Each structure stands twice: as C-alpha cells, then as structure tokens.
Amino acid sequence: MSNYKSTDALMRHLRNNGISISGSSQKQQLINTGQYDTKLKSLLYGKMMLIETALKNIALNAIMAEIDSNSIYDMYDKAVSSYKNAPPETPEDIKKKFQNNKFNLQGSIQNSIAAAYRKENPKITHFYNTVNYNEVPIWAIFEILTMGDFGYLLSCLTQNVRRKISRNIGLNLSSDTNCTLVYKYVYALKDLRNAIAHNDVVYDTRLRKMDPSKPMKQCLMLEMRLPYINFKTIGDYIILICYFLKLLKVSKAEIKAFIREFEKIQSDLLHIFRYYIAIGVCVCGHILGGAG
C-alpha cells in the first residue's frame, strides 16, 4: 500500500514544490480532491475486475483450442513465438528476440507458480501436494497471473494466436496489422488496475507507464467516434473501459449508468472548484493542471 502523508504534511510538500497553499479553505480543497479520487477508484474497481477476468477467459479458451490441450508445455511449443516456429521470412535477430522472450515468459510463469506455492495458494498447492498430479494446467496458471504478466504472455504469443484472441474479443483490427492491440490495451488497463489496487492516485493519470501506440489511438477514435485521444486524462481511460464493456456485451443500460456516475463525480468536484475560484482561494487548479 502507498505511504500517505497527512493533509498538513501534504500542504508542506506542495509549498516546498512551489505551490502557494495555506489556510483551512485550501486544506479542505485537498481533502475534496482526495475524496474525488477515492470515488473514482470505487467506480472503476468493479469494471476493471470484470474486464480482466473476461479477457483472461477469452485468451485461455483461444489458446487451449489452438493447442488442443491444457498443458503449459504445449502452449510454449505451439502457441508462443520462438526461434523454431517463426515464419521463414523472419529476420535472424527477430527470431532470437522471440526465443529470448519465450525464455523470459517461462521464467516469469515459473516464478509466479513458486510465489503462489510459498503463499500456500490452493489453486497451485493442490497440484503439487497431490500424488496423482505432476503438472499445473494452463487454466490454474491464468488464475494467478497478474495483469502485467498476462499482458506479457499475450505479447509472446504467435501473431496467429493473438489474431484469434483479438477477433474473439471483437477488437477492430483494421489498423492493427501486427496484432499488438490486444496486449497493449491490457498494458494500459494494467496501469489503471494497479493504481486502484495499491490505492495510488488515478484522477490525473500519473499512473500511465506507456505511451499509446498509433493503432491504440486509431482503433478507439474509429470505434468510439472520437476526434482525438492520448490517454493523458482520466476521461480517456473511461472511454477505453467503455469500449471493452461494449465488446464484452455489457448492456447499454449498465454502460450508460457507469458514464452517468463518472459525470456526476466530475460535476460534484467541478462545482466545489468553481466556488473556491469565485472566492479567490482555489489551489486545486494548480494541483489538477486547471479546474476548467
């Protein structure tokens, strides 16, 4: 969990970093901003869990159908890119990159299994503490993968398997010739999911760890009829979530209710900001980069 400052300590921190702030009114604004962020995380949590679970299930089913097995070793051999299964025209350096990525994936999954076993996670200990079992099936491994590890696994799959997963999800592949959208969107969602899980700040998108690729932006602009998107505002992440909810066949009523609640949270904070701006003591504009 994050180490939080008290509100007074946070005010000192802001003053030390060039933001003029003092008094009970500006202190209350900081409290309001924290409450706003908490409401955002509460709104987003359930939707993020739904999307993560659904994407893992879709990917798992596609992989198992491709390899006709639930063996992790069959997945490595048949569904993961490597030196041996690279297309004939693949440059030598790319083949070696595929192989190194495969090694990294195997190591990452093995570390996840070992960590789960040490923590006595029954999803894993069941298979090692039972005489009749000698291998953890893919589906059990998917249950312990973090969203970041899941994204990396997707990135290591062959382009053919990624394409099948992308189509099963319903992604628009018209601008995604290399089938990178599926794992890059997972990485983008992972940043938000981790911020929520660790109770970090989400409203100003400081959580973002990657720059969106051109296909990521083009897909959303096309599918959601947007003129522009850059993932520099929380609204862009709301759009991404709504896109996946739509792909996952969540009802229009539920998606609209989600959007209305987000708009209400935004409106409530903006109303408070405008009051403080009117009386000339608004510090939140400095913190948020402009209060509107």
Where are these regions (language model features)?
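Extended intrinsically disordered or low-complexity regions, especially N/C-terminal cytosolic tails and loops
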Residues: 1-191, 203-292
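Acidic/aromatic/glycine-rich contiguous surface patches that form carbohydrate-binding/processing clefts
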Residues: 199
